[in-house]
């Protein structure tokens, strides 16, 4: 490996770490804002939306975005998003038996300030994103419907309303949007005949009266990838991987596909205490490396009692408030934002600012798989001694993350406080 390739990989790892930090910090902030509701969002999608803003930002606004995303420059950010889109977010279709992944970023501005040609070209070439001019000032509802129609087209009608009514107005200057859909089958599907209904204890947890009755749980007698830590356990459920993707260079096509295949997994972080979710997520947010450092080892272990609830979550709305709490403020300020590399100057003297970042995610987990539009003390045993069975019973609130393991990209994240609620 030459020095240039080593430097590129170092930059890629740094931004990947920034994505993980964004994932756990957003999970913390969004969860705190809605403690009694299930949560689903795509950190990678939000990361890509902010990258689109960075492509048109300058000065302190650009510096602030880069700092939140863990990138040293716009070029590094564009390279990371492009490479991730080609690998982690590549649709491995039914033909390859891999996950179905649909990802569509887009950016819209008001007609009074059209995009600069250089920005339009950059987001198309580097992010494969649509850059569109609409009339927010005079035809706001028409603009909203146009953006939602884009989302329907981009996701094959899987996501239909990225922008709900009244989410944009005549004062809106720019909207950044992302639509993402994921459908993957478990590497080892659960047997539907083993599914049984049992109580699930909500976040207030203490008594049987607080339990949600008759929640369907998936169960299995197979070995599972489970790690036991101080105060919590982690389960990793892998999705079926696609057939190996041969390096293009071996076919004479040139280029680098960034590894031979993608490998997705869902990690469930289950606190020991029924009311321990909030504290666990705060621990994760305090140190970005926490998530990947606590993932289970590659080899499965025997399990005793094992239950994971089926669930479906649909979440949508603005993520601006949470991002402001993470220190990203200048892009959303009408007085201070510097997006001068994005749109033409209309002579008004008012700087362009990001009016909103709307985001929607849909996740469903069942027996077949998933549909989705800190110091550690580990007890080691000699290899000749079989480990004792581990119980993993997710009968109270837990956090989950869908990760593409080859790139470490956190594609989806959230928490479940009540599997009976969508």
Curated annotation (Swiss-Prot):
Residue stretches in coiled coil: none
InterPro entries according to UniProt: Serpin_dom, Serpin_fam, Serpin_sf, Serpin_sf_1, Serpin_sf_2
Superkingdom of the organism of origin: Eukaryota
Site (Reactive bond): 383-384
Pfam families assigned: Serpin
Keywords tagged on the record: Protease inhibitor, Serine protease inhibitor
Region (RCL): 369-393
An example molecular function term from Gene Ontology annotations: serine-type endopeptidase inhibitor activity
CC per GO annotation: extracellular space
Keyword Nucleotide-binding included in the entry's annotation: no
Function statement: Probable serine protease inhibitor.
Family: Belongs to the serpin family.
Record comment regarding domains: The reactive center loop (RCL) extends out from the body of the protein and directs binding to the target protease. The protease cleaves the serpin at the reactive site within the RCL, establishing a covalent linkage between the carboxyl group of the serpin reactive site and the serine hydroxyl of the protease. The resulting inactive serpin-protease complex is highly stable.
Protein name: Putative serpin-Z8
Source organism per UniProt: Oryza sativa subsp. japonica
């Amino acid at each position: 490996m030459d020095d240039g390739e080593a430097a590129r990989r170092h930059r890629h790892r740094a931004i990947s770490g920034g994505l993980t930090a964004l994932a756990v910090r957003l999970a913390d902030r969004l969860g705190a804002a809605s403690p009694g509701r299930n949560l689903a969002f795509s950190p990678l999608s939000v990361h890509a939306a902010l990258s689109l803003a960075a492509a048109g930002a300058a000065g302190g606004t650009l510096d602030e975005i880069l700092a939140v995303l863990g990138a040293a420059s716009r070029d590094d950010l564009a390279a990371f998003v492009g490479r991730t889109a080609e690998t982690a977010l590549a649709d491995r279709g039914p033909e390859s038996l891999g996950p179905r992944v649909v990802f569509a970023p887009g950016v819209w501005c008001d007609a009074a300030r059209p995009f600069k040609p250089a920005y339009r070209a950059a987001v198309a070439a580097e992010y494969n994103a649509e850059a569109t001019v609409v009339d927010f000032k005079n035809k706001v509802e028409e603009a909203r419907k146009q953006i939602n129609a884009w989302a329907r087209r981009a996701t094959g009608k899987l996501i239909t309303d990225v922008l709900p009514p009244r989410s944009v107005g005549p004062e809106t200057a720019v909207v950044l949007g992302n639509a993402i859909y994921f459908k993957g089958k478990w590497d080892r599907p659960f047997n539907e005949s083993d599914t049984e209904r049992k109580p699930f204890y909500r976040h207030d947890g203490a008594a049987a009266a607080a339990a949600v009755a008759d929640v369907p749980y998936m169960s299995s007698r197979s070995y599972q990838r489970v790690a036991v830590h101080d105060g919590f356990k982690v389960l990793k459920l892998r999705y079926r991987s696609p057939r190996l993707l041969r390096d293009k260079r071996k076919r004479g096509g040139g280029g680098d596909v960034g590894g031979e295949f993608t490998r997705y997994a869902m990690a469930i972080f289950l606190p020991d205490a029924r009311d321990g979710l909030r504290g666990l997520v705060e621990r994760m947010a305090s140190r970005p490396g926490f998530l990947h450092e606590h993932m289970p080892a590659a080899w499965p272990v025997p399990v005793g009692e094992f239950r994971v609830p089926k669930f479906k979550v649909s979440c949508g709305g603005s993520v601006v408030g949470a991002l402001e709490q993470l220190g990203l403020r200048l892009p959303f300020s009408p007085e201070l934002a510097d997006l001068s590399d994005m749109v033409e100057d209309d002579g008004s003297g008012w700087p362009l600012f990001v009016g909103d970042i709307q985001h929607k995610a849909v996740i469903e987990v069942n027996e077949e798989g998933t549909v989705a539009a800190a110091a550690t003390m580990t007890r080691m045993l000699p290899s000749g001694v079989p480990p004792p069975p581990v119980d993993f019973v997710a009968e109270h609130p837990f956090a989950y993350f869908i990760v593409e393991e080859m790139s470490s990209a956190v594609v989806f994240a959230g928490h479940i406080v009540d599997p009976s609620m969508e």
